Amino acid sequence: MKNINSEIRQQIRNAVINSINKSVETGELPSLEVTDITIEIPREKGHGDFSTNVAMQITKAAKKAPRQIADIIIKNIVTDGTYIDKVTCAGPGFINFTLDNSYLYETVNIIQQEKENYGRINIGNGKKVMVEFVSANPTGPLHMGNARGGALGDCIASVLDAAGYNVTREFLINDAGNQIEKFGTSLEARYIQLIKGEDAIEFPEDGYQGEDITEHMKDFIAIHGDKYINTDSEERKKVFVDFALPRNIARIKEGLESYGIHFDIWFSEQSLHKSGEVAETIQLLKDRGCTVEKEGALWLKGSVIGSEKDEVLVRNNGIPTYFAADIAYHRNKFEKRGFEWVINLWGADHHGHVARMKAAMAALGINPDKLDVVLFQLVRLYRNGEIARMSKRTGKSISLMDLVEEVGRDGVRYFFNTKASGSHLDFDLDLAVKQSNENPVFYVQYAHARICSMFKLLESEGIKVPSANAIKAELLDKPEELELIRKLSEYPDEVRISAETLEPSRLTRYVHDVASTFHSFYNACRVRGEEEELMQARLVLVDCTRIVVKNVLDLLSITAPERM
């Protein structure tokens, strides 16, 4: 796909570097080497279309003031054969580039030709990437942390796919360890209580109290009765877990499906133990001199993971810790399955685990830079201006399913991606269901619906959207028209930056800006009732807006309604 903004950035980059080299040759600048420069879109509209701070970057090496360097670069710059119309200096030494409108008119052509592929780029070159997210505890329902992590992870995966990576979405099923032991103990206690009465056994103080535990055991009893009342406890707990856990996982899958999330792989933690990969990984760490035995347990040396204290890998009862299994799991991702880049989404409370896991990878001979962890902050739900803790429907803690039912999938996914992952998120439930421009998802969807309604009306009058090749694009010269095209031209860059930063919140901000810019255009520039050639040109521009809004919403897995 053609990325005209990328082409322009390269033109600017080449022109600036060539100018610096020429300035060195003429003696206006001392000998220095510049191989790349930062190019950004200025915040101030009057400062051109693109800008670079290269003069400030090389001021020390050039032994001149940034403004003086900028003037020299501008004096020697050659822009023939580029989209650059004007080069100026601003502030302490920013070099600003104003482009001629031909690039905007070419953008209109590109958008209409590429349609749903507009914005897709190829910075990934098919690199094999795994995004592991949600990975909720399978002993209970999906909570708000899972909901936010799900929206973030799914959008990150979609953005990387649009950027040319070969993406796999994975859910780790934590079906081993302490939480499964606690799950089995909770099921066993409830089973005995249902058969013999509540006084027959005390429910574990730290057990799972959810109604699903009771529901599982009632359904189990309906099938098997009291058959297991005298069975050995360990055997009985295994039977109960084998019955209840798949039901919980099925509910998690159902909840995520309703949320628009589809995983390629559901990976069992238990499989790592059964295959011997956990033991194999522990042995590898031992062979590399990374472990120490003490107090009857096996520890990973703190010096290996940059910690003041050692970490237990195998307890004194011979059972590996979750940390050991997690190291084996990450080794499996890289070495067994060949992923070149692994991205995990974890709650911010896991921040201390990031450095340890990266260090563990390094200890295994795996490049830790191939592992990235996106940490996301907590969510607070608000209703009527107060923190909402209970579901309207159930009167219990709000689960993901409750949230989707109350707000709708589109609203939930959009709102969870409005803030950077590292920021706390206040989710206004009342705002998310408002049918007004105050609601950002409604505002964006309305822009798409408004365009579709316009086209339907025009089609009933025999007017169709022409091909961009058939219009006089130069008629689009009003500030509102040019600003809208300029905004549409930024989409491939937004995909690129979102992929590089793993921040899909850029896309919700961007599509809201597109909708806002479109509404400004629509209020300032008539489409129907204008002279024929101008109407045709504006129809193409409106169609390009529809394409971009839909493409962004598709990337966010949010519907683009044709009427509202």
Curated annotation (Swiss-Prot):
NCBIfam families in alphabetical order: argS
Keyword ATP-binding carried by entry: yes
Name of the gene this protein is made from: argS
Similarity section: Belongs to the class-I aminoacyl-tRNA synthetase family.
Motif ('HIGH' region): 136-146
Protein name in the entry: Arginine--tRNA ligase
EC number in record: 6.1.1.19
Primary location recorded for the protein, binned into one broad class: cytoplasm
GO MF, one annotated term: ATP binding
Quaternary context: Monomer.
Reactions performed catalytically: tRNA(Arg) + L-arginine + ATP = L-arginyl-tRNA(Arg) + AMP + diphosphate
Record key words, sorted: Aminoacyl-tRNA synthetase, ATP-binding, Cytoplasm, Ligase, Nucleotide-binding, Protein biosynthesis
Pfam families xrefs: Arg_tRNA_synt_N (PF03485), DALR_1 (PF05746), tRNA-synt_1d (PF00750)
Annotated localization: Cytoplasm
InterPro entries: aa-tRNA-synth_I_CS, Arg-tRNA-ligase, Arg-tRNA-synth_N, Arg-tRNA-synth_N_sf, ArgRS_core, DALR_anticod-bd, Rossmann-like_a/b/a_fold, tRNAsynth_Ia_anticodon-bd
Source superkingdom: Bacteria
One CC-aspect GO term: cytoplasm
Biological processes annotated in GO: arginyl-tRNA aminoacylation
